[in-house]
Amino acid sequence: MAQGSDIEIAREAKMQNIAEVGAKVGIPQDALLNYGPYKAKLSWDFINSVQGNQDGKLILVTAINPTPAGEGKTTTTVGLADGLNRIGKKTVAALREPSLGPCFGVKGGAAGGGYAQVVPMEDINLHFTGDFHAITSANNLLAALIDNHIYWGNKLGLDPRRIAWRRVLDMNDRALRSIVNSLGGVSNGYPREDGFDITVASEVMAILCLSSDLKDLERRLGNIHAGYTRERKAVLASELNASGAMTVLLKDALQPNMVQTLENNPVLIHGGPFANIAHGCNSVLATKTALKIADYVVTEAGFGADLGAEKFFDIKCRKAGLKPSAAVIVATIRALKMHGGVDKADLGTANPEAVRKGGVNLARHIENVRQFGVPVVVAINQFITDTDEEMAMVKEIAEAAGAEAVLCSHWANGSAGTEELARKVVLHAESGSSNFAPLYEDSMPLFEKIDTIAKRIYRATEATADSSVRNKLKGWEADGFGHLPVCMAKTQYSFSTDPALRGAPTDHVVPVRDVILSAGAEFIVAVCGDIMRMPGLPKVPSADFIKLDEQGQIQGLF
């Protein structure tokens, strides 16, 4: 009998009241701020009350460079959390909230798949508890205050040519990348070039995900560089009196959200920065709270390990003082074939030789994660078209690179399909073999940090940048920002900046075409190659297939 679609499986789920789910990890009912029977936010009183608890063990789930459909990282994170609970380890999954952009663009949903899902799936994929709308509103409030300040006399001397803040929208819309605002006459302000990013690329999103509490949130928001004067002096959001109102908009959004897996295990979903154009991790607050209430916390970082895992280690763990105990790299036979040169249309055809050739991508990711001192297990996310010979090939490739590979069937079998993976993860996590350290020191010059990532993670010969980029970095170092980590914005499909360059390329160059100071989030964004901070929709977007049926139920989310 064929397995139902993700949305059909999710609809058949026997969800527990969120209070029952919370009770499994010691969360009392009065600590939950309910959004209906199956969603809740955690109260500040509860978050503060558990800070003295001992931390559980933190497990990162990352992946090889993906196909456009993704390789099942969220599905594996959910499956592993269920698997750990199955073998008696009290476990919480800590995930990012899906963006509407990919839901209506390529993916059609991002709450796991098959029998390894988070529910209520439709709510999570759409508006959820409104956090993204609050982030969008806070971001755009600052944008409105900037233009309003210029309109009413520009007391701070903002140079309209040097406004650093863009508006955002949680949608893929290439038409908004570059616009001219304030057209239509003098009553509408001073026209200037402007543009939109997607909400998940907003610095406000990064700030929310890296803030420890409301006071820290307001401090970071106040430090945002809204723009610069003609003398190139930074104008901060606090100088525009924006940070207080922005904090008010984000007050509830800063509290983590709790939902459940299909097997009724707790999941904290909070924040959702992309890993190709932002830092790609869920909130520090959700992760640290989960660590205080569980034996194990399983979290994921976006796209491949060259992006999400590197940022998880070098930004999130560095800034939050987190020490991961183990990492899981998700690999699929289809993606390895793609890296071995097989066309998308032929990925379902058995081809062990292509798996062998594409295995260099997996081996590179294993080597890279091990550079951080973290033990690695490979999860082979099984598809029905995979052959025994191909799966054996992946195990050989992983073993040669220093990691054990485990076949996982959580999509079809739920926690029963990840029990072996869970036991392997526990073996590594409890062995004490993790010796985590970031890739570079805080004191390293900014461009040297970029170059270090390019050489050691992407295996490039060098990173390049013109004098304007280098001068920006030197200026920020002189202003006291030299200690910040760097956040690389590049394609997710390759180790290089060329999405068509598959496998494990070497001897390539990483061109840095711009750098952006995120003074509130406290990192430097290095924009590499042709990456865009506002995606576009594909020729046939998922939105074409999403609709309500005659019974008023949503169709097309998957």
UniProtKB/Swiss-Prot annotation:
Signal peptide: none annotated. Disulfide bonds: none annotated. Belongs to the formate--tetrahydrofolate ligase family. This is Formate--tetrahydrofolate ligase. Gene3D superfamilies: Domain 2, N(10)-formyltetrahydrofolate synthetase, Formyltetrahydrofolate synthetase, domain 3, P-loop containing nucleotide triphosphate hydrolases. It holds the Pfam family FTHFS. GO terms for molecular function: ATP binding; formate-tetrahydrofolate ligase activity. Disruption phenotype: Mutant cannot degrade vanillate or syringate, but it can degrade protocatechuate and 3-O-methylgallate. Mutant shows O-demethylation activity toward both vanillate and syringate in the presence of tetrahydrofolate, indicating that ligH is not directly involved in the O demethylation of vanillate and syringate. ATP binds at residues 67-74. InterPro entries: Formate_THF_ligase, Formate_THF_ligase_CS, P-loop_NTPase. Keywords: ATP-binding, Ligase, Nucleotide-binding, One-carbon metabolism. It catalyses: (6S)-5,6,7,8-tetrahydrofolate + formate + ATP = (6R)-10-formyltetrahydrofolate + ADP + phosphate. CDD domains: FTHFS (cd00477). Pathway: One-carbon metabolism; tetrahydrofolate interconversion. It comes from the Bacteria. PROSITE patterns: FTHFS_1 (PS00721), FTHFS_2 (PS00722). Its EC number is 6.3.4.3. GO terms for biological process: tetrahydrofolate interconversion.
